[in-house]
Amino acid sequence: MTEFKETELDERAIKMAKVLSADAVERAGHGHPGSPVSLAPIAYTLYQHFIKHDPNDPNWEGRDRFILSGGHASLTQYVQLYFSGYGLTLDDLKNFRGGADTRTPGHPEYGLTPGIEMTTGPLGQGFASAIGFAYGQRFQRGLLDPEAPEGESPFDHNIWVICGEGDIEAVSYTHLRAHETDQYL
């Protein structure tokens, strides 16, 4: 695992992520400020120090995939996409939940905002899909690049997911556990 030490810049950026999230919900007049504020440290740390991604090529095959299972916490991801240079602006954050033409709807929508890997909303959907993404990645690597040394294939990307207890409760734990031990997920 990569060694990590938080810097003063990281601390300031995390505080800014919290303020931007709370402000966007306040401007919208509705939404969920608690999750984006509490998830700001982990989301910032993942996006800035661990997740392999390229804002100039959001569909790069070798990128890691990040799924925010609890779609109601979408500001968590929007703020990180803004910080990372995916083309979101402060005005986009101010227009959170701003209607049909917003780039920052109440739940992440695949195809609408660059950097969003999938639409999430119902609890458990993102968590279960992340497991599907991991199976797909493993299958794709085995099919298209089985001889490459570990870590050297574009198909060696990671699947990152943030989920809560509601997501886990919504998915059959026993079913997932059976597959997890078979596939080393």
Task: Identify the meaning behind each predicted range.
Residues 77, 172-173:
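Residues at alpha-helix caps and immediate loop-helix transition turns in enzyme cores, especially N-
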Residues 117, 169, 180:
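Acidic-residue sensor for enzyme active/binding pockets
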